[in-house]
From Swiss-Prot:
Protein name: Ribosome-recycling factor, mitochondrial
GO BP term, example: translation
Recorded name of the encoding gene: mrrf-1
Protein keywords: Mitochondrion, Protein biosynthesis, Transit peptide
Example of a GO cellular component annotation carried by this entry: mitochondrion
GO molecular function: ribosomal large subunit binding
Originating organism: Caenorhabditis elegans
PANTHER family, sorted: MITOCHONDRIAL RIBOSOME RECYCLING FACTOR PSEUDO 1 (PTHR20982:SF3), RIBOSOME RECYCLING FACTOR (PTHR20982)
Amino acid sequence: MIRLAVIRLAQGASRAQFLQKQAQIFTSAVVNAKKKADNKKKNPPAVFSNLEENAVVQETIKEIQRVEGLLVEELTRHFSLKVDIRQYEDVMVKLENGKDKPLSMIARVTLKSPLMIMINFQDNPSAIKAAKLAIQKSTLNVTPQQEGAVLYVNVPPMSKERREKMASDAKGRILNEYKKAINEIYSKSDKKSSNEFSTRPDEAKKTREALLNMKHAAEQRGGLLIEERRKQLLKQVV
């Protein structure tokens, strides 16, 4: 879902201010998490004052900040004790033509009651079978029931087992998605750097080292934040 959100961001810059605010929230949360982290582990440098003139590095910093903001959004939804229909809207569905689309683009998702999701396929009934399968295979841990062109999903109440499942999903799926998004940014920036500094090997080497350090630092910050949120959730398990 993080990568899906990255694609949506590329389609419009209207969320820039929101993401900047989310990045600030992320930074604050990471500071708290670092205080509790193993002191034997040192964080890679996140600020490169000697590369302020390097356009590739500066653009990469902005891209990483956007993804970090998206991670905060994803974790907020994931660990919320309330039903969030966006978790269902973002489920990717593989259609008969082989294309993957989020559920929100092929059906109307609404909250019928506090613990029931209604997914209406009236305008796209041929997609209901694929959507049902996608929901069943997702990490939502629910079983949709079909009535005509509508799927109904009973959301299970919060329990010890469900909290533990949410914590496990965060450490696995969400962290992997986040790392994949960060790695894509690194790969794109590294390729751009190689082309831009093809005749300046020293600058290319310095840029590559900076990009790699930024990648590792972002991965560590993301891991710290996820671990902090997991611990907070599991504290509520009796």
